[in-house]
Design a protein with these regions (language model features):
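Terminus-proximal functional modules
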Residues: 1-191
Length: 191
C-alpha cells in the first residue's frame, strides 16, 4: 500500500483545522493512518495511506483516561459507526464516511455546545494550566540566576540569557494557544 508522510504544525487549539485537513486529504485519496512525534521540534508526523477519494468526516477527542476505561470508550464510538484510527498525545482520532451519516448531528462527535465545551475545558485544565504553572515557576528562577551569573563569567550569563529568551518565546506560544482556547470556550459558552 502506498504511503505518504507529511509534517505539519497544529497546536492543541487547532484541532478543528486539523480535522479539516484530514478531510481534504481523504477527498484527494489519502486516508490518515498514524500520528507520531517527529524529529522536527514542533511539527507532528502524519502518515497517510492511498485510498479511494471519498467524503469522510474526521473528529478528534481529547479524553485522557485509565486503561480500564479504554475498551468501553472505544466501543461507544464503534456503536456510533466512528472508526478509531489512532491515539496521539491524549487525543483520539476518529473518522466516519459521509455515506454512513444519517443526520447533520452525526457529522461531529460532540454535536452540542456542552460536549464541545467539556472537551475545551479538559484541554485547558490538563494541558495548558500545568505548562503555565511550570513557566510561572521557571521564569522568575531564571531571572534570579541571571543576577548571580555575573559571578560565573560570560558563558553562564549567555546560557542563562538564552534560557530566559527561549522561556519567554515558549510563554508567548502557550499564551497564544491559551488565547485561542479561551475564545473557543467563550464562543461555546454563549451558545
Amino acid at each position: 500500500m502506498e504511503k505518504k508522510i507529511v509534517y505539519r504544525i497544529f497546536t492543541i487549539a487547532d484541532y478543528e483545522r486539523e480535522t479539516l485537513y484530514f478531510r481534504e486529504m481523504h477527498a484527494k485519496g489519502w486516508k490518515l493512518r498514524k500520528v507520531n512525534y517527529s524529529i522536527l521540534l514542533f511539527a507532528v508526523k502524519y502518515t497517510f495511506e492511498k485510498c479511494h477519494p471519498e467524503q469522510v468526516s474526521y473528529q478528534l477527542d481529547f479524553y485522557p483516561m485509565e486503561k480500564s476505561e479504554r475498551a468501553t470508550y472505544l466501543q461507544l464510538f464503534k456503536d456510533c459507526v466512528w472508526e478509531h484510527i489512532t491515539d496521539f498525545n491524549s487525543f483520539s482520532y476518529f473518522r466516519k464516511a459521509h455515506s454512513e451519516i444519517e443526520s447533520n448531528a452525526e457529522f461531529e462527535i460532540y454535536n452540542d455546545a456542552a460536549g464541545k465545551l467539556a472537551m475545551v475545558n479538559r484541554i485547558l485544565r490538563l494541558r495548558l494550566v500545568p505548562v503555565l504553572l511550570l513557566l510561572a515557576i521557571h521564569i522568575p528562577f531564571l531571572f534570579k540566576l541571571l543576577n548571580r551569573s555575573n559571578a560565573y563569567g560570560l558563558w553562564s550569563l549567555l546560557a542563562v540569557g538564552l534560557d530566559i529568551f527561549l522561556s519567554l518565546i515558549l510563554l508567548l506560544i502557550v499564551s497564544s494557544i491559551g488565547w485561542k482556547l479561551w475564545h473557543k470556550k467563550k464562543e461555546l459558552s454563549d451558545l
